[in-house]
Amino acid sequence: MSQDIYDYANKLERAVRALPEYRKALEAREEIKADEAASQLFDEFVAVQEKLQGLMQTGQLPTETEQADIQALSQKIEANDLLKGYFNAQQALSIYVNDIERIVFAPLKDLAK
């Protein structure tokens, strides 16, 4: 029985990759990679995101300067159609992922009751 759960997880992983929303996000990511300006902006976004996660893990908040930098980056992303398309595709995909997470973790939530 325990092996079955891994088989189900692998089937679920393949099913997510087969979703039109996943394919759209993947295509959007490839378009970003092919565009130097969009790729550079994406890399900057990832770096800022990692820095924010590090701050959060240590209980720190971004400085006013960092907040201004984040706001400026957000505006650049919003003005870039490739990045906007990618993040919209990711948002559509995240609906499935959130639903799957809720379903998978329901038994653990039941244990806390």
From Swiss-Prot:
InterPro entries: Com_YlbF, YheA/YmcA-like_dom_sf
Chain segments annotated as transmembrane: none
Superkingdom, natural source: Bacteria
Pfam family, one: Com_YlbF
NCBIfam families xrefs: PRK13676.1-1
Family that this chain belongs to: Belongs to the UPF0342 family.
The protein's name: UPF0342 protein SZO_10960
Species whose genome carries this gene: Streptococcus equi subsp. zooepidemicus (strain H70)
Lineage: Bacteria, Bacillati, Bacillota, Bacilli, Lactobacillales
